[in-house]
C-alpha cells in the first residue's frame, strides 16, 4: 500500500482510508472486525469514523461504531491513523450538537472514551453549524490540539467559501488550521472540482473524499427497474431515503451503463475503474472506502495497487461525466 502526504503537514497516510459507518447497524461486530482485519491485511492503516455513526441509526445507536473500532484497536492503536468527527446530534439537548465550544470539547472526550484512546490523529467537524461563530469553533479545535487530544483538524461537507473563511480566521487568530476536507466525490458527483478542489490545491489541504462508489451504485450491482436491495445503503434505516435521493435516478443509471462498457474494455471491474478514477486526481489524498463484507474491499485494493488510470481512459471518463460537475450540492 502506497502512502501520501496529508496536505501540507508532515503526516503520511495510506492511499485508501477505511470508512466505518456501516459498523453497528448494517454490519454486526463480528462482520465489522472481519472488514477491519481485511483492510489491515491489505495495507490500509488509515481509519475514518464519527460519533454519530452507524449510518442509518438514531440517537440510541450513535457511538456504537466508535466503540466497535475502539475494541478492535486495542493493543494496536499505534499502527493506525484514526480520524473521527463531531457536530451531529448526540443527545436530547440543543447543545448536544453543533460547533459550539461546549459541544466540541465534550464530544472529543466522549469519542476518545469510546475509541479507547487518549488522542485521535484527525478531528473533523462533520458539517457546518450556522448558529456558531466560526472563531468559536476554531478556538475550540485549537484547544483540542493544544491539550494533545488531536494532532490535526479538518472539516467534512463544508462549502469552499466557508473553508476559505476558516483558513483566513485561523491565520488571523493563530488558531489550529484546517488541514483536511472530506467532500462527497465520485464519477456521478463532481461538484467538488468547481471551487473546493482548486482551493485545496492552492492551500495544501488534504482531501479524503467519501462515497467514491456512489453508495454502491458504481459497483454495477443495482438495477433501476428493480427495488433497492435490502441490506444496502439504499435501504439502510433512516439513510436509505437519503441515498435514493442522491443516486437512484434514471440519469445516474444511464451513466453507470456507459461506464460499465468502458470498464469492460479496460478489463477491470466497474468498482475498480471508479476508485482508480478518484485516485487519478492528484488533489486526492485518500478516498474513503466502505464495505459491508470483507470481500467488497478487493476492488478498491486492486484500484490502489494498479494506480492511476491510463490517460486515455481517464479522459473518456472525464468527458462522459463532465455534466456531473454541475449537480446541485443538495443532491
Task: Name each model-derived stretch.
Residues 132-320:
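Beta/alpha (TIM)-barrel catalytic core signal, keyed to glycine-rich beta->alpha loops juxtaposed to Asp/Glu
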Residues 18, 49, 84, 122-125, ...:
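Conserved beta-strand positions
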Residues 41, 70-78, 113-116, 145, ...:
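Acidic (Asp/Glu)-rich catalytic clusters
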Residues 112-131:
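Active-site groove signature of glycoside hydrolases
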Residues 20-30, 90-102, 131-132:
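Active-site mouth loops of central-metabolism enzymes
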Residues 1-80:
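N-terminal binding-site loop/beta-alpha segment at the start of enzyme catalytic domains
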Residues 28-39, 99-115, 163-167:
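Short, acidic/polar
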Residues 52-53, 75-99:
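Structural motif corresponding to the early beta-alpha repeats
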